[in-house]
Amino acid sequence: IIDIMKKESRKRLYTGGIIGPVAAFLYCVGYYHLVLIMNEQYQAWGWICFFVNCLGIICGGAYHSHCAYFGLIGRHAHEESMNEIVKYLGVQKYFVFGLQGIGFLALAVFIVLGWTIMPRWMFCFSPGILFFLAPLTRKLPKGLNIAIGGGWTNWISIIYYALALITMYVYK
């Protein structure tokens, strides 16, 4: 990734670094649906799931913003600095994926238990379950594996939120 990023323009690196936190904010707005879909007696669990997911995606936005360093510092061949950044991001990713994993697992469990207005089949399309399909995207034909596999976490959100909007409209 460093070899690719260090060839990018400064403008693209700055823009890419800023997109992460902005996207995190938008995801937090979207995560509010976790409160809206909960049956009334389980609202507190919806709020907990909302806050866990928000914290995870905020850490993810910060993680994304640090990727600009791969290009900004990488082009100057500061190997020691790059090694520190790689180590730091290696630690930070556990917070991102850990928190998001807990939040997504909670959502899947809530759907299966019938705590939400979502039909139980939505479990199959919940982000935590779709995430496990990531290894299959690497088996797609060349071109598709990059278009779909490279942006799989984005596709997860597109699939889930499209179906969530439909089911919220139909079942509410």
Where are each of the predicted segments found?
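Hydrophobic, aromatic-enriched alpha-helical segments typical of multi-pass transmembrane helices
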Residues: 1-172
